[in-house]
């Protein structure tokens, strides 16, 4: 009798083990997730200067080659023309220290940090208080989403190799979003309706685990079709990176008045930021015109 009981218990244990093995990676064990620790800087493409562009494989400016509609192609051209005169173009909100939001924050003007937990993956922009939450707890989309800069993200980890380890994070981010948004500092525009959808596949490189990919597909009414870019990041070699504070407002010398941006000089005077700029309206300021 005891032998039959022991045999039955062993059979149940074996069946359980086989079930766990066949089910692939188990979400209850962090050891089954990729090691994303460290500071991740944007991948610098040789010959392109390492600028903080959205598509790192294309030249700066119009060379980004986003499939813009004619209306939004003109928005980009007007933005670049304004920047050529010293202005900010569509980048004005970010220049005034508004949060970058999606997808600009993934350009990684400062290194990114990925914090993986069982139910949420956090993406932090180094040196600032700007971050994303990607919920991986199996939730559905809420009926109402509050407007935000980063959007609302739901994802899931996938074991593509069937080896019991998660290796790809798939995520979708929806709005409504806040503010006038751009892909990067060129002013490459997203639609002003703020209803973009971003779909991502985040994974370590198969050959070099110190390279991280983020395939971002953008669905936006400023585009003629969905646009996919494979953004890459390089893990810094420091095993214990220091994360120092670096808030935009502490280093900016720009001041917005109405729809104009001016420089604040060292002696506290408002100075023009581009050619042919009208003087600031100082009726409510104690400053002599200059």
Question: Regions from the language model: what does each represent?
Answer:
Residues 1-12:
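Bacterial N-terminal signal peptides that target proteins for export
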């Amino acid at each position: 009798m005891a032998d039959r009981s022991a045999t039955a218990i062993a059979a149940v244990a074996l069946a359980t083990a086989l079930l766990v093995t066949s089910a692939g990676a188990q979400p209850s064990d962090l050891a089954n997730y990729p090691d994303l620790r460290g500071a991740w800087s944007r991948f610098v493409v040789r010959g392109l200067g390492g600028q903080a562009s959205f598509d790192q494989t294309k030249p700066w400016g119009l060379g980004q080659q986003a499939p813009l509609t004619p209306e939004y192609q003109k928005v980009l051209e007007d933005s670049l023309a304004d920047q050529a005169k010293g202005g900010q173009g569509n980048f004005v909100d970010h220049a005034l220290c508004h949060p970058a939001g999606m997808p600009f924050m993934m350009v990684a003007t400062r290194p990114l940090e990925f914090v993986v937990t069982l139910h949420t993956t956090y993406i932090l922009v180094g040196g600032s208080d700007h971050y994303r939450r990607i919920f991986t707890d199996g939730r559905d989309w809420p009926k109402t989403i509050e407007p935000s800069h980063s959007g609302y993200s739901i994802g899931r980890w996938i074991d593509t190799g069937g080896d019991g380890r998660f290796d790809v994070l798939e995520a979708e981010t929806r709005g409504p979003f806040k503010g006038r948004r751009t892909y990067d500092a060129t002013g490459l525009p997203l639609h002003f309706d703020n209803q973009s959808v971003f779909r991502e596949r985040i994974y370590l490189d198969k050959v070099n685990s110190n390279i991280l990919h983020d395939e971002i597909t953008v669905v936006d009414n400023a585009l003629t079709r969905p646009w996919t870019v494979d953004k890459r990041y390089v893990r810094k070699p420091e095993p214990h990176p220091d994360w120092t504070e670096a808030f935009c407002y502490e280093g900016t010398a720009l001041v917005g008045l109405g729809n104009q941006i001016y420089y604040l000089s060292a002696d506290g005077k408002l100075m023009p930021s581009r050619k042919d700029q009208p003087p600031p309206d100082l009726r409510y300021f104690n400053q002599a015109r200059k």
